[in-house]
């Protein structure tokens, strides 16, 4: 614990205080009108009697830092920014029940549109979060087909070969040629309009374009416009909920620790998000809109009238919020929101029950809140790879997934592969609560052997696996296998982890094989040397895109119609 003498140097000014552990990592961040008074309160045990979390934090804190600000408002904003960056263990934190993607329109001379998994410190306008990755990718595809905004990371200062999207008519190609900046920016503004929920203009544009092409008997183009229009309407029709005369609002339903957010823009429900957090509505608003920097709508509807602090309300109003109101229980949107909230609560309870059961039934040292699963994949000993997936509170944490190439292992040897991955992973990273190995007794024992080689034992981590033939849960050493009914929540959880490790490993293995296979295919074509091969791969990205390209498109890259025809013939098009 920190020595009380540290209080002598703390000023009686507004600011932010930061408790740090012995590694120098922030473990709790707070703000104060008077830093000295606030920090002093932590040294009076009466102030946190019964608060185990605060007591534990103070036990682990070995240092205290602080930042003086000009006023309370600055301290409020700085606290939120520091929590966003450091995610301290003992602050009340909002936890996603799954990964929610964003769409980013960058702030550049020629902005690009891109799909990102997590909000980063990047210049531009963020839209989201969205509940459906496929929805996000489909929306970007539609917007590019209409407005031709780039999505590549190419250096526009150096003109290069046009990308495949340019040839498809889905990009203006500023990396390839000079583009009118005014025209491009007009397209960007229209994209932003659609992402803000206003789809009427783009619908009207597509309808008119379809009719115009039909009038001049360009039926191929007319069909393209029709298909794009149908896709757009289907994307938004599936989630359409008319509400509040087309206004923008967020509907927040909650029964702590579960919070549900329905995002409605221009009368369309575009996203349903769920989170877990121990805290009040005020805590949620602070975390969701201020710490995470999600843009507030003009209206927030909630189930209860709770008092919100003036500093949070003032901040949200500066960002565009007009008011927070209580939602009417007789409205259709309430019924839908409440039903979704109850479903999420049930799902969370099922996961919580499975984790508690896992501790008891598998005789684990603690509840497996963090599970890491490992699987090996190869093709008859070639292209050996490993996957590592991470589950937190029973849910996949995809930013924690890792891939490993095992090029040194030339023969089919799962045991040596597992030993290699275990050592590479846990020499640098902390152990999970439960280590899951996709395999039987031999694979599990190999993992334990590798852990011993780097200084760990079964006192440090539990290790289990699942035998593929009959879904038996296997343990290290002489511990007998465990048979559970297929519908048992613990077995279902482990099978979920197993299937995810397998899916991730197989996907990586196929990707590796595909890349090497594609290069081999091009190597076999007469007239394709290293330079042309590099240009083709850079331009088209892969064999599938090359197959879809016309001879004319390939000719532009290889500078020879004869070689372009030979490529098409060699790849299967006679």
UniProtKB/Swiss-Prot annotation:
Pfam families: GIY-YIG (PF01541), HHH_5 (PF14520), UvrC_RNaseH_dom (PF08459). It comes from the Bacteria. Its main location: cytoplasm. GO terms for cellular component: cytoplasm; excinuclease repair complex. CDD domains: GIY-YIG_UvrC_Cho. Keywords: Cytoplasm, DNA damage, DNA excision, DNA repair, Excision nuclease, SOS response. One of its GO terms (biological process) is nucleotide-excision repair. Residues 12-92 form the GIY-YIG domain. Residues 200-235 form the UVR domain. It is found in: Cytoplasm. GO terms for molecular function: DNA binding; excinuclease ABC activity. HAMAP family: UvrC (MF_00203). The UvrABC repair system catalyzes the recognition and processing of DNA lesions. UvrC both incises the 5' and 3' sides of the lesion. The N-terminal half is responsible for the 3' incision and the C-terminal half is responsible for the 5' incision. Belongs to the UvrC family. Interacts with UvrB in an incision complex. This is UvrABC system protein C. It comes from Petrotoga mobilis (strain DSM 10674 / SJ95).
């Amino acid at each position: 614990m920190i020595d009380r003498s540290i209080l002598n140097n703390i000023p009686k000014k507004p600011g932010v205080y930061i408790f740090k552990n012995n590694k120098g990592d922030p473990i709790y961040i707070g703000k104060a009108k008077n830093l000295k008074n606030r920090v002093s309160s932590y040294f009076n045990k009466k102030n946190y009697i019964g608060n185990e979390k605060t007591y534990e934090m103070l036990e682990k804190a070995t240092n205290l830092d602080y930042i003086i600000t000009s006023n309370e408002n600055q301290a409020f904003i700085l606290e939120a920014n520091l929590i966003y960056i450091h995610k301290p263990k003992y602050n009340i934190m909002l936890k996603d029940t799954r990964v929610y993607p964003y769409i980013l329109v960058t702030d550049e001379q020629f902005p690009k549109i891109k799909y990102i998994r997590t909000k980063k410190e990047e210049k531009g306008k963020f839209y989201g979060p969205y509940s459906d990755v496929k929805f996000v990718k489909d929306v970007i595809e539609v917007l590019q087909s209409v407005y031709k905004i780039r999505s590549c990371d190419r250096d526009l200062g150096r003109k290069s070969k046009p990308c495949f999207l340019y040839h498809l008519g889905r990009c203006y190609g500023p990396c390839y040629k000079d583009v009118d900046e005014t025209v491009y920016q007009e397209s960007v503004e229209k994209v932003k309009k659609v992402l803000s929920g206003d789809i009427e203009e783009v619908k009207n544009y597509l309808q008119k374009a379809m009719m115009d092409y039909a009038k001049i008997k360009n039926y191929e183009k007319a069909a393209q416009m029709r298909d794009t229009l149908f896709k757009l309407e289907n994307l938004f029709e599936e989630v359409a909920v008319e509400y509040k005369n087309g206004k923008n609002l967020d509907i927040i339903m909650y029964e702590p620790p579960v919070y549900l957010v329905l995002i409605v823009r221009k009368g369309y429900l575009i996203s349903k998000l769920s989170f877990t957090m121990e805290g009040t509505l005020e805590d949620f608003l602070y975390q969701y809109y201020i710490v995470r920097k999600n843009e507030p709508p003009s209206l927030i509807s909630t189930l209860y009238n709770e008092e919100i602090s003036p500093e949070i309300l003032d901040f949200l109003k500066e960002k565009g919020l007009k008011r927070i109101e209580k939602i009417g229980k007789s409205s259709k949107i309430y019924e839908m929101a409440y039903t979704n909230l109850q479903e999420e609560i049930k799902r969370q309870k099922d996961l919580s029950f499975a984790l508690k059961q896992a501790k008891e039934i598998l005789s684990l040292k603690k509840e497996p809140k963090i599970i890491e699963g490992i699987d090996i994949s190869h093709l008859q000993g070639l292209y050996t790879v490993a996957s590592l997936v991470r589950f937190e509170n029973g849910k996949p944490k995809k930013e924690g997934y890792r891939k490993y190439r095992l090029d040194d292992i030339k023969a089919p040897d799962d045991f040596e592969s597992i030993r290699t991955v275990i050592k590479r992973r846990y020499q640098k990273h902390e152990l999970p609560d439960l280590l899951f190995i996709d395999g039987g007794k031999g694979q599990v024992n190999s993992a334990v052997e590798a852990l011993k080689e780097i200084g760990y034992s079964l006192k440090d981590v539990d290790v289990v696996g699942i035998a593929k033939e009959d879904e038996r849960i296997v343990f290290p050493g002489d511990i007998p296998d465990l048979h559970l009914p297929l519908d048992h929540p613990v077995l279902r959880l482990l099978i979920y982890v197993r299937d995810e490790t397998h899916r991730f490993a197989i996907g990586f293995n196929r990707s590796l094989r595909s890349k090497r296979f594609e290069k081999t295919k091009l190597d076999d074509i007469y007239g394709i040397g290293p330079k042309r091969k590099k240009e083709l791969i850079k331009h088209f990205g892969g064999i599938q895109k090359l197959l879809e390209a016309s001879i004319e498109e390939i000719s532009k890259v290889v500078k020879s119609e004869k070689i372009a025809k030979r490529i098409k013939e060699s790849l299967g098009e006679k």
